[in-house]
Regions:
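An N-terminally biased module of ancient metal coordination in phosphate/nucleic-acid-related enzymes
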Residues: 1-86, 90-91, 134, 150
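Extended substrate/RNA-proximal surfaces in nucleic-acid metabolism proteins
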Residues: 2, 66-141, 148-216
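Hydrophobic faces of well-ordered beta-strands that scaffold small-molecule active sites
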Residues: 19-23, 54-56, 94-98, 164-166, ...
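Acidic-and-aromatic substrate-binding clefts and catalytic sites of carbohydrate-active enzymes
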Residues: 33, 63, 172-173, 199-203, ...
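Non-catalytic positions within long, well-ordered alpha-helices that form the structural scaffold/packing
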Residues: 47, 185, 241-242
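Short acidic/histidine-rich active-site segments
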Residues: 59, 246-262
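His/Asp/Glu-enriched short active-site or ligand-binding loop at hydrolase and phosphoryl-transfer sites
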Residues: 215-227
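Short active-site-adjacent structural elements
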Residues: 226-230, 237, 256-262
Length: 266
């Protein structure tokens, strides 16, 4: 009941570029949108909130063995062809990345070199005062107002340094997880840890701050700031935000219903 009465969170402040940097709207590939119709509903919901684009971040993990980069690119191409036929949606920019679980299969994914990364220019935002942009990415972000990429899966025009969105299990730290983060850095990418504030059972807030100090970028869930995941998660998210430790935010929407429940406003 308390969640219903909470004030709505302004996206203009937390997504100044108008791009949802984490959502599961690519239909039928993971625990997100189940159909193209539902995915289109999510996009319309994002547009109603004033968003101009989204980065699709389907899971790559053992639970979804079919989710190889090649398969996801194919599914993304099919979905964007559907989106482009929707006159009501208009010029909504879609990009494809992935959310990689740091599990036993991750070292093989990284070694393959075929990764679905996030290009900083996709965020289409100058560096806002409440976000922490790692050194080397600020210039790319400052140039994003000139970007006109749409429905992109290509590496053409990408910035040199890329974000690789990764996540941890909620209940148990995997063996070698810090070594995996180091290997991402060694490969020339910036690890972008998804929803760090939600890892209450496995990491303390001090651990998150230590990761940020090591060059690990943090991506918050907007729902964490509205109390969607509970008061403890909200408190950690507010603390990290106050100290400018977040690099990006995303809705992490898995359905249109979830997007509505996040209590967001333009």
């Amino acid at each position: 009941m308390l969640r219903f009465f909470q004030p709505r969170l302004s996206l203009r402040r937390h997504l100044p570029g108008g791009v949802d940097a984490h959502c599961h709207l690519l239909p039928g590939v993971d625990d997100g949108a189940e159909s193209a119709e539902e995915a289109l509903s999510i996009i319309r919901g994002q547009q109603a909130l004033g968003l101009r684009g989204a980065i699709c971040t389907p899971h790559i993990m053992a639970r979804y063995p079919q989710n190889t980069p090649a398969y996801l690119r194919e599914q993304f191409a099919q979905f964007t062809s559907i989106v482009n036929r929707q006159s009501s949606i208009g010029n909504f920019r879609l990009h494809l990345a992935a959310e990689y679980m740091l599990d036993e299969a991750f070292p093989r994914h990284l070694a393959s070199g075929d990764l679905l990364t996030i290009d900083p220019v996709w965020l289409t935002q100058p560096q806002p005062p409440n976000l922490n942009i790692p050194e080397g990415l600020g210039v790319a972000l400052a140039e994003t107002g000139k970007s006109n990429i749409q429905n992109s899966t290509s590496s053409i025009g990408q910035s040199t340094q890329q974000f690789l969105l990764v996540e941890l299990p909620q209940y148990l730290l995997p063996p070698g997880w810090q070594d995996m983060l180091d290997s991402i850095l060694a490969a020339g990418h910036t690890p972008l840890l998804a929803h760090p504030e939600r890892y209450l059972r496995i990491l303390e807030e001090g651990d998150l701050r230590a990761l940020a100090a090591r060059g690990i970028a943090l991506q918050g869930n907007l729902g964490s700031l509205t109390g969607y995941y509970g008061s403890r998660v909200k408190a950690i998210a507010q603390s990290l935000l106050a100290d400018k430790l977040y690099t990006t935010f995303g809705t992490d929407s898995h359905s249109y219903g979830m997007l509505r429940q996040l209590k967001l406003t333009a």
